[in-house]
């Protein structure tokens, strides 16, 4: 009797079973929906194509961005549904570039709403005090513009300017080679996508070769990986898992 009851729980001869393609199709569909939800509300991956954030972030770094650091947002309009926090000075953030919404930028938050920002001979002053910018690097001794020269550039001397409400002043750590708020202004709060928090992969390819965002999952990236010699292709193992500060 026990054996009969146990067998009765199994599939009966001739019972209907889902086709192979349907089972895998449903699994792929569920995985796709979960990926969309994670990308829209939780975490999104980005790659670093330029050196404006060196040495904190290098070309070829792949990082994850916490998308709910500053609130749960409408994935279509990027408007905050549920506020959870505000950007803090020193945060490394990804945002929609105000001058071209098709581009995402990554910089460090320097000025908060209401702050008075002034740059004097490369040194950042916030509300009249010299800011602590240990992460910043400079490699060009020339001042642009000179202290008493024409103001056709704002790289090394700027302001003072006051950060508007609901906006932020951002800069790259590679100060002499970063296109940031010194040149195009402030970042509205609605443009923020999230806070960068970890490097999950990092590699260095041949000089002047493009960095493919699809490297980890795309066939083109794999072909490049196996076609390059070991001296041209380098995985930066010491950067994988590094927390972004």
Regions found by a protein language model. Give the residues of each.
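Soluble "head" domains of membrane/secretory-pathway proteins
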Residues: 2-22, 37, 41-47, 52-245
């Amino acid at each position: 009797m026990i054996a009969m009851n146990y067998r009765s729980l199994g599939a009966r001869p001739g019972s209907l079973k889902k086709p192979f393609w349907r089972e895998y199709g449903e699994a792929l569909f569920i995985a796709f929906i979960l990926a969309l939800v994670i990308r829209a509300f939780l975490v999104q991956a980005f790659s670093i194509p330029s050196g404006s954030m060196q040495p904190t972030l290098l070309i070829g770094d792949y990082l994850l961005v916490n998308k709910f650091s500053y609130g749960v947002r409408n994935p279509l309009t990027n408007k905050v549904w549920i506020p959870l926090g505000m950007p803090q000075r020193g945060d490394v953030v990804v945002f929609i570039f105000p001058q071209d919404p098709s581009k995402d930028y990554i910089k460090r938050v320097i000025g908060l709403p209401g702050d008075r920002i002034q740059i004097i001979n490369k040194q950042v002053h916030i509300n009249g005090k010299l800011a602590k910018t240990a992460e910043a690097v400079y490699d060009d001794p020339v001042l642009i513009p000179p202290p008493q020269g024409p103001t056709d550039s704002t790289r090394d001397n700027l302001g003072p300017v006051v950060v508007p409400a609901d906006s932020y002043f951002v800069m790259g750590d590679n100060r002499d080679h970063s296109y940031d708020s010194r040149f195009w202004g402030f970042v509205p709060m609605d443009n923020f996508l999230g806070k960068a928090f970890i490097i999950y992969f990092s590699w260095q390819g041949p000089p002047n070769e493009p960095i493919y965002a699809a490297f980890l999952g795309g066939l083109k990236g794999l072909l490049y990986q196996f076609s390059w010699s070991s001296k041209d292709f380098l995985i930066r193992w010491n950067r994988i898992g590094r927390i972004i500060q």
